Structures are given as structure tokens and as C-alpha cells.
Amino acid sequence: MSVSLLQPSFLMSKTRSYAQILIGSWLFLTAMAIYLSLGVAPLDFQQGGNSRILYVHVPVAWMSIIVYIATAINTFLFLLTKHPLYLRSSGTGIEMGAFFTLFTLVTGGFWGRPMWGTFWVWDARLTSVFILFFIYLGALCFQKLSVELASILICVGLIDIPIIKFSVNWWNTLHQPGSISRFGTSIHVSMLIPILSNFANFLFLTCILFVLETRLLILSFLESSITEEIEAREGIPKPSSLALFASMAEWLKRPT
């Protein structure tokens, strides 16, 4: 990536237009996803209305994994470059990923209660997703102590991603094997479209939050001095350490 692409003026000008496009698209996708999930998609003949939970559960499960991979990439880039934007992006990813993973577990529990007779079973897929949630929580806690510890945890935690993906193939689980693959899908198109619509909805929402976080990071340093920022955080252990502020100050002074 060209260094010029990470300059404040370039990012502020581009993210302004991107944010408007993303927000407009997200509002449209939200309305469409709700309409398709509640008004168009047919009920499963075995699950009844309970099948509508899957139109949300499946997309957020995908997002929990996608956000983790994106967070790991940002974490790795931060360790290589020490650029503050990568640190902020990884922090946003950890928060978003924890939310999506928790939402996955909760919606899965509500779906499983009438179908399996219980909110929770120690199924291989459930357990591996549960571990992913604790990896996110651990990274959130470590961020307050050491950015490096949080980064290492995120990188090591990548091993859980293929376990989540292939757990239904490696072990005998209550979850069925994947219904969507590069070879095709076993889901009827009337049910597939609402799932993909909700997935696009959550994906756009995540992109919006990443863009807004980028703008907020830049504005927070442009509108107040580095000294004031350090004093405001004095005594509060946060990943935004003195080194990060110095790095940000140097970055903002670079010629555009």
C-alpha cells in the first residue's frame, strides 16, 4: 500500500464520501433484509417460525469469523508498521467481533431451545465458537494492559477459525454440514436470499463503523493537542500509550 494512501488529508476526504455511500446502502439493505426475512421467505415445514432466527444467526456467525480474520490482518500490520490506524482498526474489530460472536451464541440458543430441547449443548461447533468469544474477551482485556499481548493472542487465536469451519466434518455434531460452499448450495433460493441480504446488511454496518472510527481517530488528534490527550488519559491504562501518541503526532505532521 502506498504511504500516501494513509495520509490524513486523503483519508478524511475519501472516508467522507465512502461513509455517505455506505450509510445509504446500509439503510436500504436493512429495510430489504427485514422485508425478505419476515414478509417473503417461507416458513420451514419442520421448524415453522423458528426458522426465521436462522436468517440472522447464520449471517452473524459468518461475520464473527470474517471480522476476526480482518482483525488479525490489522494486528499483524500494526506489529510490522506500528501505524496507529492499524491499532485502532484492530481494536474496533475486537469489539465488533465480540458482539457478533455473542449474538451468534444467543440466537443459536434461542433456535436450539425448541429444536434441541435446550439452550446449550457442548457441541463441537458451539464449543469452538464459545472459545472464539473468550479469545475476543481476552484481547479486550489485554488491550488495557499491553497492545503486544492482545496482538499475540489474536494471532494465536487464528487456529480456532479452521476448527469452527471444519468441526462439523471432523466430529459428530448436532450441527449439519455447511449448506453453502463453492460447489453450490443446498438451501432453496427463497431462503438463501434473506440470509445473504442480512449478511450484506451486517457487512455494510461493520464497514461503516470502521470508516467512522478512522475519521474519529484523525479528528481527535487534529482538534486537541497531544499534551491534552496524554493528560486526559493520565493514570488510565489504555492501548493508546505515549508511544502511540508520538506515532500519531509524527504521522499527522507528514507532508500530504
Swiss-Prot record:
It is a multi-pass membrane protein. Keywords: Cytochrome c-type biogenesis, Membrane, Mitochondrion, Transmembrane, Transmembrane helix. InterPro entries: Cyt_c_assembly (IPR002541), Cyt_c_biogenesis_CcmC (IPR003557), Cyt_c_biogenesis_CcsA/CcmC (IPR045062). The chain crosses the membrane at residues 21-41, 60-80, 91-111, 129-149, 151-171, 192-212. The keyword tRNA processing does not apply. GO terms for cellular component: mitochondrial membrane. Coiled coil: none annotated. It comes from the Eukaryota. One of its GO terms (biological process) is cytochrome complex assembly. Its main location: mitochondrion. GO terms for molecular function: heme binding; heme transmembrane transporter activity. It is found in: Mitochondrion membrane. Pfam families: Cytochrom_C_asm. Belongs to the CcmC/CycZ/HelC family. A stretch of 270 kb of the mitochondrial genome is duplicated within the centromere of chromosome 2 resulting in the duplication of the gene. The expression of the duplicated genes (At2g07681 and At2g07771) is demonstrated. May be involved in the export of heme to the mitochondrion for the biogenesis of c-type cytochromes. This is Putative cytochrome c biosynthesis ccmC-like mitochondrial protein. The lineage of its organism: Eukaryota, Viridiplantae, Streptophyta, Embryophyta, Tracheophyta.
